[in-house]
UniProtKB/Swiss-Prot annotation:
Residues 83-92, 162-182, 229-293, 362-418, 477-490 are extracellular. Residues 1-61, 114-140, 204-207, 315-340, 440-455, 512-574 are cytoplasmic. One of its GO terms (cellular component) is plasma membrane. InterPro entries: AA/rel_permease1, AminoAcid_Transporter. This is High-affinity methionine permease. One of its GO terms (molecular function) is L-methionine secondary active transmembrane transporter activity.
Length: 574
């Protein structure tokens, strides 16, 4: 009956042989009889309920691996590069620290929203799965919007620029608009090349550089406490905590929201495990431990690092340091040579983040190609010639290059930061508001929704309102001279973000409406279980003159069409 159906009853997943389908689905519950170590079902606990079929591929990621995925993605250059900007916008040490605490609370609430969706739909794909589950009509519309969001944003560009600035500082070379651009492009190209030619070497570099990140932030934190205790040379202290809230009155609504954007930029990555949940051992237990552990650890470390900055760096230097605050911190504590060494280490940390981001983005582009969403899908789905998503990686390299070269050099890092954060807030608002709608539907008895981890109405509502504020507030005009950009309008990142989503809407009209009408076919989709054991959506064209009216055909005819389409595309992409 309709009131007893699961929320995801239209996702069409089932079992056959190598390629498996279903035209209807019921609640998936792991029973005691199915928990068998031999068939891999021991990755789930008896009695757990899921709103989708479970991936059957190899489970490789445990708790420590998932903690590493989150920390390596979150700990990029944010805490090294944005603290100066946050202090400048807030006007005081106390308010700046409060912004870091507020950002951490927003990120933790977001983590629990993603954990709820992740334990309801423990499959690879992250927010794409959740958006498609919430916004089922018009079909393919939200998929096109999400594809545009992924395709046109240069996620790795900001940290590539920061890597360039850090390496130039380490070399004691003046940073100019062209050398930072040139090295920034070279950094992205290096990341593209490594991840394309040898995936194992790329992962090895990411892990090694991840150790550098943890070591740097721990060392800065300890040094800060030593400074507060008067343990530096000649008992030096900055005395920034004598009146911690002095200057708070200069903060504006525009400054607060942009400071919060910078903080949230530093927490991007808390949902990183959701992209690979199909490969996680016992995803419910793993998320319960890995998610909160990573977030609490990094939130505390971020606060300690900022306390260290304020304990050592005088206020005038805090304002002028911009992206090289960490290097100036080491300069004050240990001298000029330490500044150059610190800049090199922070540059390596940024490089590790670039490697991690382009690694993930290339695979998302490849997956969109495999599903059939992108034009020239076979091209983007290909793993030739090095068994890597080289085309997807190259696409992200091109977008990052344009993002690095297009804006004025002084504004490039902040533009990328805001250009990533703003549309991400739109996505997060849609997901959290959708979860509130699910709660309402469940309360009305219209759907079943009982994932193992629940964020709850209060946490989800807080995350929804936080993102709504972050969507609206950037339109408040800044006071004179307060704009975060020196050569561009303060609203430029908002316009670009909405333009990208608008393009996704236009693509939907052309790809999913006009072309099928002109070509006399319909786009149909099924969740397909491939030979690798992982479920993925497959979109295929079903021509009217081949099988008649698609809406009246039995599922077997359509499934046969998709299977053949899926097999042929797999063969072409190998």
């Amino acid at each position: 009956m309709s009131e007893g159906r699961t929320f995801l009853s239209q996702l069409n997943v089932f079992n056959k042989e190598n390629y498996q389908f279903s035209s209807s689905t019921t609640k998936k519950e792991v029973s005691n009889s199915t928990v068998d170590a031999d068939n891999g079902a021991s990755d789930f606990e008896a009695g757990q309920q899921f709103a989708t079929e479970l991936d059957q591929g190899e489970k490789q990621l445990g708790i420590l691996s998932c903690i590493g995925l989150i920390c390596n993605r979150m700990l990029g250059t944010g805490v090294f590069a944005v603290s100066s900007t946050i202090y400048t916008l807030c006007g005081s040490v106390g308010l700046a620290l409060i912004m870091w605490a507020v950002g951490a609370i927003i990120a933790i609430s977001g983590l629990y929203v993603y954990m709820e969706f992740g334990t309801a739909i423990p499959k690879n794909g992250g927010e794409k799965n959740y958006l498609e589950a919430i916004f089922r009509k018009p079909k393919f519309f939200i998929t096109c919007m999400y594809a545009a969001y992924i395709f046109f944003l240069g996620w790795a560009a900001g940290n590539s620029i920061n890597t360039a600035i850090m390496f130039l500082t380490a070399a004691d070379t003046e940073v100019t608009k062209w050398n930072q651009r040139g090295i920034g492009v070279a950094v992205v190209f290096f990341a593209f090349l490594i991840n394309s030619l040898n995936v194992k070497i790329g992962l090895y570099l990411q892990n090694i550089l991840g150790i550098f990140k943890i070591g740097i932030v721990l060392f800065i934190s300890i040094t800060g406490w030593v400074a507060l205790g008067g343990g530096l040379k000649d008992g030096y202290q900055s005395h920034n905590f004598r009146n911690a809230f002095e200057g708070t009155e200069t903060a504006t609504a525009y400054g607060i929201v942009n400071a919060l954007y910078s903080v949230i930029w530093s927490f991007v990555g808390y949902s990183n495990v959701n992209y690979a949940l199909g490969e996680v051992k016992n995803p419910v237990r793993t998320l319960k431990i890995a998610g909160p552990t990573s977030m609490v650890f990094l939130a505390i470390i971020y606060i300690f690092v900022n306390i260290a900055y304020f304990a050592v760096v005088p206020k005038d230097k805090l304002i002028s340091s911009k992206l090289i605050l960490a290097a100036d911190f080491f300069d004050i504590v240990f001298g000029g040579q330490a500044k150059r060494a610190a800049a090199a280490l922070v540059g390596l940390s940024a490089l590790g983040n670039v490697l991690s981001v382009i690694f993930s983005q290339g695979r998302i582009i490849q997956q969109l190609g495999r599903e059939g969403v992108l034009p020239f899908s076979n091209f983007f789905a290909s793993s030739k010639p090095f068994n890597s998503p080289m085309v997807g990686l190259f696409q992200h390299f091109i977008v990052c290059t344009v993002t690095i070269l297009a804006p004025p050099p002084g504004d490039a890092y902040l533009l990328v930061q805001n250009l990533i954060s703003y549309p991400m807030n739109i996505i997060n608002f849609a997901i959290s508001a959708g979860l509130l709608w699910i709660y309402w539907q469940r309360r009305q008895g219209k759907i079943e929704w009982n994932p193992p981890i629940k964020a709850g109405v209060f946490v989800t509502g807080f995350f929804t309102l936080s993102n709504l504020y972050l969507i609206i507030a950037p339109y408040v005009p800044p006071s004179n001279g307060e704009s975060v950009y020196s050569s561009m309008p303060y609203w430029i990142h908002c316009v670009i973000a909405w333009g990208i989503f608008f393009f996704g809407g236009v693509y939907y009209v052309v790809w999913a409406q006009l072309l099928p009408r002109w070509g006399h076919y319909k786009l149909v989709s099924k969740d397909v279980l491939g030979e690798d054991g992982f479920w993925r959506v497959k979109i295929a064209k079903v021509y009217d003159d081949t099988i008649g009216d698609v809406d009246t055909q039995e599922d077997g005819v359509i499934e046969t069409n998709i299977i053949e389409h899926y097999k042929s595309e797999q063969e072409k992409s190998l």
